[in-house]
Amino acid sequence: PDEDDARTGTPFHSYWLGKIGNAQIGPIYLGKLGFLSLVCGLVAFEIIGLNMAASVNWNPIEFLRQLPWLALEPPLPEHGLSVMPPLNEGGWWLMTGFFLTTAILLWWVRMYRRAVQLGMGTHVAWAFAAAIWLYLVLGFIRPVLMGSWSEAVPFGIFPHLDWTAAFSIRYGNLFYNPFHMLSIVFLYGSTLLFAMHGATILAVGRYGGEREIEQIVDRGTASERAGLFWRWTMGFNASMESIHRWAWWFAVLCPLTGGIGILLTGTVVDNWYLWGQEHGIVPSYPEVYTPAVDPAKGG
């Protein structure tokens, strides 16, 4: 279309890339949205990197050594939902969040528009939207509902993992959160379905099983053999078309249910362990021994 930009780059081929996929590299369509997305993402990445470098006094050796532990922390609790806290007390984090979120949303619009322009369905864009939902819950929606940006996740490799562990402990163990349970079911289920489907197609590759579109509309010996295998081993088989719907929904429901579970934590449920006891998920154990006294609290 006239409003679109030209594709960029001259296509070339890679022998080694051909071993794992299509050997052709390029051209790529970036467009205005893609360009703006990359610019915003670069700004966010730069703010994070410079703040981490400043935290080690601009020492490049210490920066590389401590990189997994460095963080850009959200605003302090006393700043609440202020949109202009001091830069060194969370202002940089807010600025980073703005640019990173803008980059992600622009990239989503770009993916959606490319799919429409190519006459495809928009399944990839909506799957990406499920991941964006979880990202927004963690960094924007839940902190707003809790009334403080300090509830959000820090930027950093180990710091965000530490935040996850502390978050679970603070709210009585997320393992008892039913939506967390569902999220894990869909996470493990996705890997299982992917492994089953990938293994099946490889197993019938000698019969042209990789030509899945043909097999969907005109089932051949590859589909028949694959179907027989699964009926013989577990009594049921998906079709060449339905397995992709199974995989798509399992993958999408992982971040969707996870986001719901995070959103309910602290806003609706303060302690998932006690909630589980009240609803028959967690057994209530009787006190058999006298509780031990913490020596650190002794006089």
Q: What is each of the regions a protein language model found here?
A:
Residues 55-84, 143-174, 212-232, 271-299:
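Membrane-interfacial helical/loop segments at transmembrane boundaries in membrane proteins
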Residues 75-95, 111-142:
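Cytosolic-side membrane-entry/anchor segment at the start of a transmembrane helix
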Residues 18-41, 118-128, 171-185, 227-260:
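Loop-to-transmembrane boundary segments
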Residues 36-53, 125-147, 185-192, 253-263:
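Hydrophobic alpha-helical membrane-insertion segments
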Residues 2-111, 158-160, 168-184:
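Transmembrane alpha-helical insertion/packing segments
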Residues 3-16, 43-46, 222, 226-228, ...:
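Long, low-complexity, intrinsically disordered extramembrane tails
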Residues 52-57, 109-122, 141-154, 188-212, ...:
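Juxtamembrane/interface segments at transmembrane-helix termini
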Residues 9-25, 56-67, 72-76, 100-127, ...:
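Cytoplasmic membrane-interface regions of multi-pass membrane proteins
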